[in-house]
């Protein structure tokens, strides 16, 4: 009985392939005049399912992710709490160490700079850990950075005694202040006629006009 069923289904399949699924026998809204490979695979899979020899269809989420539309976002990352790692969540989480080698691995306290080497922004005072009334000079900035290199907050705690921003500020406070310029030096001197700004009207010198 089973052999007759198989032979009948195979003969029907061959008959269908010979006539290439003619619209006179059936209707396909996508390709009415030609059989697609997808239709053939779907038909063969149906025959194999009825015969009991079809393999179960396995779907992978990684392949399905390509079909997502619209804005997508990924949350989580290093040091952002526990994450669901792996398809079954069986990959352990590893907390990243964000401190230096010589700093105690204690996240309960802030392990930032002992004295932040930055001037106070608007609305901040020395109580916020910044430097008030910092001179706006290149010399002060240069000295500030040179003195800052004497102390590495991550690996050089013994160098803490060398860092003293109050003495540095007192040292630089007596220096010359930056003079304000009321004249732009770039606008002085003879104008170059061959330099034309973008989107400007071409300017011809008097010599070119006389030559014409």
Swiss-Prot record:
InterPro entries xrefs: Secretogranin_V (IPR007945)
Annotated region Disordered: the residues are: 171-212
Q: In terms of domain of life, where is this protein from?
A: Eukaryota
Single Gene Ontology MF annotation: enzyme inhibitor activity
Q: What is the effect of changing residue 178 to G?
A: Abolishes proteolytic processing
Alphabetical GO CC annotations of the entry are: extracellular region; nucleus; secretory granule
- Is Signal given among the entry's keywords? yes
GO terms of biological process kind: intracellular protein transport; neuropeptide signaling pathway; peptide hormone processing; regulation of hormone secretion
Q: Say what happens when this gene is deleted.
A: Mice have no demonstrable Pcsk2/Pc2 activity, are deficient in processing islet hormones, and display hypoglycemia, hyperproinsulinemia and hypoglucagonemia, similar to Pcsk2 null mice. In contrast to Pcsk2 null mice, they develop Cushing's disease due to excessive secretion of corticotropin from the pituitary and die before 9 weeks, indicating a role for Sgne1 in control of peptide secretion from the pituitary.
The task this protein performs is described as:
Acts as a molecular chaperone for PCSK2/PC2, preventing its premature activation in the regulated secretory pathway. Binds to inactive PCSK2 in the endoplasmic reticulum and facilitates its transport from there to later compartments of the secretory pathway where it is proteolytically matured and activated. Also required for cleavage of PCSK2 but does not appear to be involved in its folding. Plays a role in regulating pituitary hormone secretion. The C-terminal peptide inhibits PCSK2 in vitro.
What name does this protein carry?
Neuroendocrine protein 7B2
């Amino acid at each position: 009985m089973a052999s007759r069923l198989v032979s009948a289904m195979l003969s029907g399949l061959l008959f269908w392939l010979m006539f290439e699924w003619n619209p006179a026998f059936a209707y396909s809204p996508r390709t009415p005049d030609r059989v697609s490979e997808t239709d053939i695979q779907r038909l063969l899979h149906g025959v194999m399912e009825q015969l009991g020899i079809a393999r179960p269809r396995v779907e992978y989420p990684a392949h399905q992710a390509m079909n997502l539309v619209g804005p997508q976002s990924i949350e989580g990352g290093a040091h952002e709490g526990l994450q669901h790692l792996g398809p079954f969540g069986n990959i352990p989480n590893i907390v990243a160490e964000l401190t230096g080698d010589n700093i105690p691995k204690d996240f309960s306290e802030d392990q930032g700079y002992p004295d932040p080497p930055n001037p106070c922004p608007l609305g901040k005072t020395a109580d916020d850990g910044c430097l008030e009334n910092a001179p706006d000079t290149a010399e002060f900035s240069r000295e500030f950075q040179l003195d800052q290199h004497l102390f590495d907050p991550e690996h050089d705690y013994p160098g803490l005694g060398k860092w003293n921003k109050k003495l540095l500020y007192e040292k630089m406070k007596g220096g010359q202040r930056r003079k304000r310029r009321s004249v732009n030096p770039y606008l002085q001197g003879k104008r170059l006629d061959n330099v034309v700004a973008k989107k400007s009207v071409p300017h011809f010198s008097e010599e070119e006009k006389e030559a014409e």
